[in-house]
Structure formats: C-alpha cells, structure tokens
Amino acid sequence: MNIKTIKKIILPLFFLIIAIIFTNAGNSYSGTKKIITLKDALTLAVKLYPGILTSKYSYLSSVYTKNETLSQYYPQVSATAGYSKNSFMNVDNNIVTSNGRIITEPGINYSLNDYSASLNATYMLYSFGSRYYNYLNAKYQMKGANAGYNYAVNSDLYNVILNFAEYFADKELMKADKENIKNDEIQYKAAEAFYKVGTGDLLDAETAKATMETAKAAYINSIFSVRIARLALLNSIGLPPSKNYVFVNTLRFKPFKSKLKGLIKSAVKNNPQLKQALYAVKAAKASVKQSVSGYYPTFNANFSYTGENSAFPLNRNYSAGLSVSIPIFNGFLTKNKIDYSKAALNSSIWNKKLTESNLIYGVSSDYYALNNQYLTVKALKSSEKASKLAYTLAFKSYEVGVGSMVQLVTANAQYISALTSYINGRYTYFYLKAKLYSDLGLIPEHYLK
C-alpha cells in the first residue's frame, strides 16, 4: 500500500473523528441542565419577564420627563449664522461727460456678500409658581411610575410563585395517580386470582379492572397537566420552553406568625398600588397650582448680540433687557384648566381612599385565609394518614377473604382522594402566602433576600 492510498484512507477517517468529537461536544453542551430554585426563578423573572421590563422602562421615561422640566431653571441660549450672496444683472451704466452729456454704456453685473451672526439668550426670572409646580407635577408622576414598576414586580413575581407551586402540585398529583394505578393493578390481580381458583366472582374482577382503567386515564391526564404547568411557569419567568431547565422544589410548609394589625400597617406603608394612588393625589395638587399660575405674569431677562455686514469685520450690536408677559384674555383657557385639574384631583383623592379600603380588606382576607388553610392542611394530613391505614387494612382483609371488593375499592378511592386534597391544600397554602406578601408589596424583600 503506497503513501497516496494511505492518505486517501486516513484523512477522511481523521475528519470523521473530528466531526464526531465536535458533534458530541455540542450535544453535551446543549444538554446541560440548569437547576432553578424558587429564588432563582424569581431573580430570572425580574431580569427577563417582558411585563416587568415594560414597567421598568416606563418608569425610566418618567425620570427623563421630570428632568425635562428642569430646563426652565436654566437660560435658553441659541445662536444663528448666515451667509447670502445677492447678484445684480445688467445694471444701467450711465456716464456724465464734462460738457454735461450723458453717455449710456452697456449694463454691468455685480454681486454683494451678506454675512450675519446672532446670539440670543432668555432666562425666566419669576413665574409665580408655574415653573416650580410643573416640575413638582412631573416629580410626583415619576414617583408614581416607580410605584407602578414595583407593583408590576410584585404582581408578576406572585404569578411565578403561583405557577411554581402549581407545577409541583401537579407533579405530586401525578405521583398520586401513579400510586392509584399501582393499587388498582394489585386489586385487579388479586380479584382475578381469586376468580380463577373459584373463591371469587367475575364481578369483583371486572370491577377492579374498570377501576384500574379509569385510574390509567386519570394518570394520562395528569402527565399533560404537568407539562402545561411547566410551560406556564417558564412563560411567567420569561424563559423559552426548553427541557434544559430543571426546577427544584424549595417550598417549605411553615406556620405564619405575624399579627393582622402589623400586616395592615405594613401594607399601608409599602403597598405599591397605594403609593401610586398617593403620588397621583400629590401630582394632581401640583397640577391645580400650576393651572392657577396661568393668571399671573412671568418675568424674563433677554440678551442678544447680532453682527451683519457685507465683509468682515461685522457691524456688531448688543441688546439686553427685561420683559414681562401679562395674560389678559385667552378664551377661558386658564379657567378650564383649573376646573379640569380640580376634577382630576378629586378623582385621585377618591381613588386613593378606594385603594386603601380595598387593600385593608384584601390583607385581612389574605390573613384569615392563610391561617385557615394552615389548619386545614394539618387536618388533611391526618385524614391522609388515616385513609392510607384504612386502605391497607381493607386490602389485608380482602386478601384473607374477609373483606369485599367494594370495600377495597372504596377504601382506595378515599385514600387517593385524601392524598389529593392534602397535596392541593398544601400548595394552596404556598400561593396564599405569596398573595399576602404581594398585597403587602414585599415579595422581593421576603423571597429574594
């Protein structure tokens, strides 16, 4: 075998090996799993969820709007420069001789350059509050937008917690359905065995089989419920529907020990919706005062420098002075602005009262619902243990020929029902707790710190 033949064989094999290595490396990289706890999910949502980012940039735009109003506190300076060339064509060219005769020569053409420059400055000296209340209005609107951003964070993070709890609830319910199938299969095999040896009847075997098939259908449904819940969780975080994310259940069932009075006080202080309503009232008050200032004059200082000539240096002129602008009549515009601002203020005041009342009611309801759910879950846990024991006893009784298939099926159904209720109750407690912290406006403080 010569060298050329060896090269023809070895080189393709070499490139094939390289391709396989890179392919495996790519598959290994793409298959890397990212572990996500509840805290991780919430942190990612703050960075990725479109609803939160929308509110964030809406708040930032209000910051720049507020900064725009500060421009009235600075001189407004502008400068212009110009150049033009004027041409004159076929201008009469008459010449007077010494003896008084006028001789007309052919017309002449000529042009003149025109240079100009100007610098103008205006500064508002006093405006009877118009400038200040315009700034104050924008400032409170900015603070309201910040509260709106915090409200979006609390609301969207609550949805993440809700979807997180529902996902793991559905996973546990799927396990319960799988256990139900296992129990039903054992029951069916036992009933069929008794029937074959003549100690049982066909009805028991068929009843057990029908129960088993129903359990299989429920299990299939629970599998897809888990998949849908996972998609909902990923969407609420702002992540794509990828299999590379592995969620880890970090929820812990603990009693809630805070007192209602302290919770209401905390909610009134921290709830972003109430803050938003409060800043809306303050902004509306500033708007009323700004509208009233429309009846008063404004004082300005003016300065200008101009230069103009057909050649350099330019002929320069300076001008400086004070001016006052006095409103006399504007078609009742100022009056209508005041009436509108006062109506908007009253609307904001009543909206604040409504928001505060709803907040106190909501926090109180959350508090009682959470405590009720905690006690309910403890009772459901006891029920689940008792029903599991009852099923075990019923199965043993059936095995020795004392119990009936009806008792066994009933006991298993009661056990699975109790287990399902316990799972649902426990995860309901988790998102009721999140709902309370959302109304308090403290989800980031409680879950992310």
Segments (PLM) and residue ranges:
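Acidic, low-complexity, intrinsically disordered peripheral segments
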Residues: 29-31, 38, 87, 241, ...
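Bacterial N-terminal signal peptides
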Residues: 12-23
